[in-house]
Amino acid sequence: MATIGLDKLFYSKITEGENGDETYAAPVALAKAMTAELSVELAEATLYADDGAAEVVKEFQSGTLTLGVDDIGKSVAEDLTGAVIDENGVLISASEDGGAPVAIGFRAKKANGKYRYFWLYRVIFGIPATNLTTKGESIEFSTPSIEGTVTRRNKVDGQGKHPWKAEVSEDDSGVSPAVITGWYDEVYEPSYADQTSDTGGEG
């Protein structure tokens, strides 16, 4: 189903343990979202047998998330891009800066008025792009965009896999209302009836 609106853009800072497993901080608002574009790159392998393709495996490799937002505040830019705020309150970006991984959550309104909710478990952003426009006869709003690389998380879920995205529609059958109402309280942690491993920690 097509989506027609985007809002409630949040991010969660990541702390990594010695083994690389992520612990997610409480989500905070990033900015007012206007657009989100997610492209995915798959790794593909083909097993040939009897002069034909016997099995084709396609696995998530990485993705690119491009967000169009109304404004990126200094503290958010510091968290997402590695820039620093100096003693005069000026945001300083250096060539040595590198963004720390974060989780990104948002929701998109569907054509039927219901929402689809998302968490991307590990995203590393670059420096935001800024568009400046001279004032002409008409008013033109110039808004920043920020691009990040999406990867799978290091921490395995209850089935021993490395998730990169969680999504749910509030009108999907079998979805608990508590999942929707608590979507931004913490980064969603997959839950399975047949848990095969102890993921441990906060998630």
Label each PLM-derived region with a short phrase:
Residues 34, 104-106, 167:
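Intrinsic disorder/low-complexity segments
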Residues 128-203:
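Mixed-charge, glycine-accented linear interaction segment located at domain edges/termini
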Residues 55-121, 126-128:
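Structured, beta-strand-rich domain cores
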Residues 1-77, 125-143:
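Solvent-exposed edge beta-strands and adjacent loop segments
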Residues 39, 79-82, 117-119, 131-135, ...:
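Surface-exposed beta-strand edges and their flanking turn/coil or helix-capping segments
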Residues 23-29, 117-123, 160-169:
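Short amphipathic beta-strand/extended segments with alternating polar/hydrophobic composition
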Residues 1-22, 101-115, 196-201:
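Short, structured interface segments that constitute the first stable element of a domain
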